[in-house]
Every structure is written in structure tokens, then in C-alpha cells.
């Protein structure tokens, strides 16, 4: 059960803030994923205020590293991200933000930012036979 007793709309819940491991600029990576298909759409960055806004408004807010300002996805493009859930990874240095994406997530107009860059060459790994079917 989630404790929702903290209700201060001007700062991030200190219990959440204490769990974050920010980079030297005070940012945490946020992986944005379509909530129903699990498609990875993009990666953005959040500071405490961007995370607070994301958790309390139902819309995703990022901190723009290039423009040094907050931006809410979809305000200019109409390609809104409606928050469905937010999880913190085990190390506290990354967020998974599940969204209902309207239109393209990428500034290039593609649904996912990972379509434009494309796959990189890789040596594909294969699971040993003894690890097949969930063994080991």
C-alpha cells in the first residue's frame, strides 16, 4: 500500500527526494515507456521539481539540459504524455515513467526516439541450453 499522506504541492516529498541519486547537475534519467505496449519512447532528465510536477499534475515535465528550463511534453507540439505510473530503480538513479503518449514522442516526428537512430551492430548472445525454459 502506498503512503500518500505527504501533501505539499511546492516541493518534492522528502521521502522520495532522499531515495534519489542525482548526477552532478542534480538530474535523474527518466525512461519514458508507453504504459500498455511497454514500447520505450524516449529518455529525458528530471530534477526534483520536474519530478514533483510529473507526480502531481498527470503530465510529464522534464528539465531541458540544453535550454536550462522546464518543459512539459506536448505543450507546443500537442504530443502530450499522460502519466500512468512512475517507478524508481533499485539504485535510485533512474526513473521509469509509464505514459499514455499522444502522437509522436520524438522531436523528429517519430513515435519513438529510438527509431531514428536505428540499431547498432552487435554480436548477439545466446542462452545456453541448460538455461532454456527458465532453468538457472
From Swiss-Prot:
GO terms for MF: magnesium ion binding; phosphoribosyl-AMP cyclohydrolase activity; zinc ion binding
Reactions catalysed according to its record: 1-(5-phospho-beta-D-ribosyl)-5'-AMP + H2O = 1-(5-phospho-beta-D-ribosyl)-5-[(5-phospho-beta-D-ribosylamino)methylideneamino]imidazole-4-carboxamide
Chief localization: cytoplasm
Pfam families registered for this protein in UniProt: PRA-CH (PF01502)
A GO CC annotation given for this chain: cytoplasm
Binding positions for Mg(2+) per the UniProt entry: 89, 91, 93
InterPro entries: PRA-CH, PRib_AMP_CycHydrolase_dom, PRib_AMP_CycHydrolase_sf
EC number assigned by the record: 3.5.4.19
UniProt record, GO biological process: L-histidine biosynthetic process
Sections of the chain in a coiled coil: none
Cofactors (names): Mg(2+); Zn(2+)
Family: Belongs to the PRA-CH family.
Function description: Catalyzes the hydrolysis of the adenine ring of phosphoribosyl-AMP.
Subunit: Homodimer.
Official protein name in the record: Phosphoribosyl-AMP cyclohydrolase
Amino acid at each position: 500500500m502506498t503512503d500518500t499522506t505527504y501533501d505539499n504541492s511546492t516541493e518534492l516529498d522528502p521521502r522520495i527526494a532522499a531515495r534519489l541519486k542525482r548526477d552532478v547537475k542534480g538530474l535523474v534519467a527518466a525512461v519514458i515507456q508507453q504504459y500498455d505496449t511497454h514500447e520505450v519512447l524516449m529518455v529525458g532528465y528530471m530534477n526534483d521539481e520536474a519530478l514533483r510536477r510529473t507526480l502531481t499534475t498527470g503530465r510529464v515535465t522534464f528539465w531541458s539540459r540544453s535550454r536550462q528550463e522546464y518543459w512539459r511534453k506536448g505543450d507546443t507540439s500537442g504530443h502530450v504524455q499522460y502519466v500512468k505510473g512512475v517507478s524508481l530503480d533499485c539504485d535510485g538513479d533512474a526513473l521509469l515513467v509509464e505514459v499514455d503518449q499522444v502522437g509522436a514522442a520524438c522531436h523528429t516526428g517519430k513515435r519513438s526516439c529510438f527509431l531514428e537512430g536505428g540499431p547498432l551492430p552487435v554480436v548477439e548472445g545466446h542462452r545456453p541450453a541448460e538455461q532454456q525454459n527458465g532453468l538457472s
